[in-house]
Amino acid sequence: VLSLQTLNRHQNQLDLIFYNSKTNNTSVVLKEIDKAYVDITDNLTFLEDNSFIWTSEKDGYNHIYHYGKKGKLINQVTKGNWEVTNYYGFNEKNNTIYYQSLENGSINRDVYSITLDGTNKKRLTKNTGTNDADFSANFTYFINTYSSATQPPLYTLNDAVNGYVFKTIKTNSELTKTVSEYKMSKKEFSTININGNDLNMWMIKPANFDAKKEYPLFMFQYSGPGSQQVANRWNNANDYW
């Protein structure tokens, strides 16, 4: 059986289709329909029993789902008012899914593991900021790339079971030292209410900021897709304004 995905011209309906090469028959096993658009991913993962893992925004947030081989929903693996921002894969030996999400705040990223039935969820990264993972082929280890608004990228080798740090690969300590020698203000995160919605924002004040004085304001904003600008991560360019 061959699987394929089709998207209509408006990009708001995606069909997951199975094609049987022996019978030359096709069947639509799953439909994704949205008023605006449907994101395409490479997250489709087939299991030994021909069931499959799928990610979808159908409940308003991007989450992980487990479907039977005929497209019947078995269970929603992750759920909550937060997004799964990266699906790393599935380890069939221990029945575990690995993913990145916003569960620790929408400006942060953490790496998690969870069993296929939605239980035994573990946060594998401990530092608040942006964490990303590159897993070994057998999901035994992962290299964690961590940074924050004040911490340059830190690379560690971690245990995929509990997140234990086996080894620090690169600290960027020299960069940290160099940056500390400059009198730069820290990035301040907060929210602003626009039309009833709390939107994330950040502000960098002058190093000698005086609340009694008025200062010119420079605003930076970009609304391209998949381009979150307010994030607790290291920015080696724009933060030097």
Features from the language model and the residues they span:
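Beta-strand C-termini and the immediately following turn/loop, strongest in propeller blades
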Residues: 3-10, 17-20, 45-59, 67-68, ...
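Structured core elements
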Residues: 3-4, 18, 28, 45, ...
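Hydrophobic helix-coil surface modules that form long, contiguous segments used
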Residues: 9-14, 23-31, 226
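Extended, hydrophobic alpha-helical segments in both membrane/secreted and soluble proteins
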Residues: 12, 25, 40-43, 52-54, ...
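A short loop-to-beta-strand structural motif that recurs across blades of beta-propeller domains
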Residues: 15-17, 63-65, 110-112, 154-156
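Multi-bladed beta-propeller domains
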Residues: 19-43, 68-91, 102-104, 114-131, ...
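Repeat-solenoid scaffold signature
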Residues: 95-97, 108-145
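Serine-hydrolase catalytic core recognition
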Residues: 130-241
